[in-house]
Amino acid sequence: MSSFDSAEGECNGLNQHYEKKVRPIIDLVDTLRALGVEKDLNLPAIAVIGDQSSGKSSVLEALSGVALPRGIGIVTRCPLILKLKKITRDKNWSGLLTYKDQTEILKEPTGIENAVLKAQIALAGTGEGISHEMITLEIQSCDVPDLTLIDLPGIARVATGNQPEDIEKQIKDLIEKFIKRQETISLVVVPANIDIATTEALKMASTVDPTGQRTLCILTKPDLVDRGMEDTVVRTVNNEVIRLEKGYMIVKCRGQQDINDKLNLVEALEKERRFFDEHPQFSSLLEDGKATIPLLGQRLTEELVEHIAKNVPRLQNQIEMKLQKTFERLKVLGESVPDDDEIELNNFLIKKLRQFMDALEEVKRVEEEPVKSDTRVFSKIRQEFVSWKHILDSKPIKMSTDLQEYVRTHRGKELPGFLNYGTFAGIIRMHVEDLEEPALKLLRNAKDIVHSSVGSIANIHFNGYPNLLLAVKEPIEKCLHEQFQNAEEKIRSQFKLEKTVYCQDDLYTNHLNLLRPKNTVRFGLEASLGNSELRETAFHLTSYLTIACERLANQIPLIVQYHMMNEYNSQLQNAMLGLIGTSDPGMLLCEDSGVARIRKDLKERLERLKDARRALPKVVHSANSW
């Protein structure tokens, strides 16, 4: 009987107490990982890391009960997902190794080492490099805890032999990819006979997890600790040297001499127990439940289950968010192009163009989505209208200063304080002319906004159809240019009209009466114009210019909106309809190969996430009761 079953409260207790709760929770993550969901989500996991020769492989061997590749240099060359499933003693041991599209059924533990080596060569080549491709090893045995671990390559300090020169960076990048995730617990393996502060693995874990909330450290090789250093090891395991929230444990695995002596793993566990039980200093660690492989297995199972349970709500939210984003991306890409049937191709083309025109119509109706800033039109043009109004509002304010300057430079035979109609009209025309260029600038800005928005909408709807996108670009540009010219002509005509001084008598009189009693100080008329006749003229000029500005404040935006949005939209929709029947739909709908691949990937992701969503409720109850 192995040490996993030897003590009450260790394996048997684990099996009885957690059987109904542990396995469903761990199986959930294993199921999601098997579905390939790890491509889309960060799944809760325990990642095993350590420097080379830290004893990492020996720990995994002891936990799994099988011999894994070991030796000098980089032994783990690919991430190895080690799934340990505890079964009852009436069932036979079984193993299953999978990588890429390969599957190997293993009936004996002795075949594990060669099978893993073969998989590593297939993924990482015959040299000494590494690969990010994963190998999955599932072991069902009565001598293992319920546990899933991810074994990562040991950290190499310098490249040796056929290793790439940047092998240290490659390994650290791979390790960091896993341990930086909030969903990952780092199981850091460190030899007990060295200064733990100098180990790269613990430094890396501390960098991404400064408080140690996701880090559990395992000390190995306690039999190699120098005499007199035992108390330091005890203090380390008791979390008194470098503090970690999850703390430390210590184990003694098979050494090379044990392997040479053909000491099997079951015997090694019994030898480990005796070592700690009889050690003068380390026996206290065993009493505290901080030593031996069986207790480590129980601790890791508890940590993993608790970690998964804690992350279930986050996992649910991630799945829903990813599903929503995937749905949206597929909606943008649309359906795949039908086969060469001409009727179906025409119908598909009509559908794509109709969707584009509907999007333009939404812009015209000012039904804009706040999150899509690239396609918003009216809200941006409205800001231009506001700026235009500010320019107009500032005109009457400057009237007193402008009037004095104009009189000084243009006065002829008129008596002081008297201005004839020609002078009055000249001042009005001067102010109106000043406003023409800002109005045209408003039009140009509106054109740029519409051009950018329609271009973005076209890119969204015709992304992946380069020929169709090119075909619609021409009418987009042509129609916009025509409507811009029409609007420009109307604006120039409007300013020509404004140079003719005219206003209805009652409207003009009302403005004049409103101005006199209230706004002399506001417009600076009292202070700057001492001459009463000149001041009266200023009242008239200010009143008329206010009326003219009110006309322009509405008229220019109406012209811009009518041509840049309404007419342009109608003309462009007619041009889109003109593409139907006049062009080869097969040629227009020739799809970019990259888009077809993206659509295929998105559909596969959608199915993975749907499967994950269906699987998740099965464990929510167990997770909530943990």
Curated annotation (Swiss-Prot):
Region feature G4 motif, mapped onto this chain: 220-223
Chain sites annotated for binding GTP: 50-57, 151-155, 220-223
Region of interest called G1 motif, as start-end residue ranges on this chain: 50-57
PANTHER family in the cross-refs: DYNAMIN, INTERFERON-INDUCED GTP-BINDING PROTEIN MXC-RELATED
Database matches in InterPro entries: Dynamin, Dynamin_GTPase, Dynamin_N, Dynamin_stalk, G_DYNAMIN_dom, GED, GED_dom, P-loop_NTPase
SMART domains: DYNc, GED
Span list, region G2 motif: 75-77
Induction details: By interferons.
All residue ranges annotated as the Dynamin-type G domain in the record: 40-313
The keyword Cytoplasm appears for this protein: yes
Protein family according to the UniProt entry: Belongs to the TRAFAC class dynamin-like GTPase superfamily. Dynamin/Fzo/YdjA family.
Positions of the UniProt region annotated as G5 motif: 252-255
Xref: Gene3D superfamilies: Dynamin, middle domain, P-loop containing nucleotide triphosphate hydrolases
Pfam families associated with the record: Dynamin_M, Dynamin_N, GED
Species the sequence originates in: Danio rerio (Zebrafish)
GO molecular function annotations of the record: GTP binding; GTPase activity; microtubule binding
A Gene Ontology term for the protein's cellular component: microtubule
Keywords in alphabetical order: Cytoplasm, GTP-binding, Nucleotide-binding
Chain spans, region G3 motif: 151-154
Top-level taxonomic group: Eukaryota
Domain GED span(s) in chain numbering: 534-624
Name under which the protein is recorded: Interferon-induced GTP-binding protein MxC
GO terms under biological process: defense response to virus; receptor internalization; response to exogenous dsRNA; response to virus; synaptic vesicle budding from presynaptic endocytic zone membrane
Main location: cytoplasm
